[in-house]
């Protein structure tokens, strides 16, 4: 998901509602950000499972607050400067989805990045481990409708008589296939709420560990064996076009290593033996 212009404008306002510093001497203040790339304009972070991309409630502490503290501690911004502009993130991942979150240190960079996400001028790729065998890659289309009461979405192949149904497109390529699971590289073409999770579940291949859209019995088996409590879905790659909109970003690829538990489960399933270069690349080192 990307943020609207109204959201971007919010970060330039002076308000305690916008930024409340992370309280020092607490467990939360000990979080160390995993910085994938940064320069004077932008920063790309590898968000861990369990962390909010942005606040859901006023009392929450999200990646945005940790980002501000990081910039303050490293001397890249002052509290006086925060009175006129707040650096922020411009895309959002589900709380229990790990991976790349892009941030802007300047208003101009934040606006440009947000526009690139909105217009899909950059490519977003995910890794996920799904139930069942998928032998061939495919580009699938459908319509997604969100139930705000349950915070859950449903996907159908055909558009039904409702204005709320939004068109979605998801493209996937199998990187490794076993008897019971498939490691997929997913190109997120549109970027709707829970799109990858719901779309894959709709075609009979839910993501392992996804209790909202997945198979409860399978998830419980992985929980018992590995302690897995969240979906094995990771935003691992951003590919920028050859356009000089933001300095240093043309043709740049940002890659985020997968979490240790994700990596362990994949290795146990034989991904390493299969010689999956895409997974080795995303893992951060040769397995």
Where are each of the predicted segments found?
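Pseudouridine synthase
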Residues: 60-67, 176-240, 262, 285
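Long C-terminal interaction/binding lobes of large macromolecular proteins
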Residues: 172
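Short, solvent-exposed loop/beta-turn-alpha elements that line the ligand-binding surface or hinge
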Residues: 155
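Short, solvent-exposed loop/turn segments that connect beta-strands within catalytic domains
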Residues: 9, 244-250
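RNA pseudouridine synthases
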Residues: 1-152, 161-169, 177, 258-268, ...
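Residues that recognize and position ribonucleotide moieties
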Residues: 91, 138, 142, 165, ...
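A glycine-biased structural micro-motif
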Residues: 249-252, 256, 268
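Acidic/polar residues at beta-strand termini and the immediately following turn/coil
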Residues: 147, 242-244
């Amino acid at each position: 998901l990307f943020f609207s212009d109204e959201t971007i404008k919010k970060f330039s306002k002076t308000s305690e509602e916008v930024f409340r510093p992370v309280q020092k001497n607490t467990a939360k203040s000990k979080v160390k950000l995993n910085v994938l790339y940064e320069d004077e304009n932008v920063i790309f972070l590898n968000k861990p499972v369990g962390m909010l991309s942005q606040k859901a409630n006023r009392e929450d502490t999200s990646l945005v607050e940790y980002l501000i503290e990081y910039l303050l501690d490293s001397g890249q911004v002052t509290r006086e400067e925060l009175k006129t502009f707040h650096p922020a993130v411009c895309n959002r991942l589900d709380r229990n989805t790990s991976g790349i979150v892009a941030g802007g240190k300047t208003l101009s960079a934040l606006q440009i990045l947000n526009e690139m996400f909105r217009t899909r001028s950059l490519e977003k790729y995910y890794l996920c481990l799904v139930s069942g065998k998928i032998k061939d890659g495919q580009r699938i289309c459908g319509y997604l409708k969100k139930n705000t009461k349950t915070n859950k979405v449903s996907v159908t192949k055909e558009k039904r008589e409702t204005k709320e149904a939004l068109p979605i497109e998801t493209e996937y390529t199998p990187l490794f296939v076993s008897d019971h699971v498939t490691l997929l590289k997913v190109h997120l073409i549109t970027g709707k709420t829970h799109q990858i999770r719901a779309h894959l579940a709709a075609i009979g291949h839910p993501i392992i560990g996804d209790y909202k859209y997945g198979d409860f019995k399978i998830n419980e088996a992985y929980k018992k064996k590995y302690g897995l409590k969240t979906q094995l879905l990771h935003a691992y790659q951003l590919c920028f076009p050859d356009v000089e909109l933001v300095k240093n970003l043309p043709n740049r690829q940002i890659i985020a290593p997968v979490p240790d538990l994700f990596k362990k489960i994949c290795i146990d399933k034989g991904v390493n033996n299969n010689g999956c270069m895409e997974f080795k690349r995303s893992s951060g080192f040769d397995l």
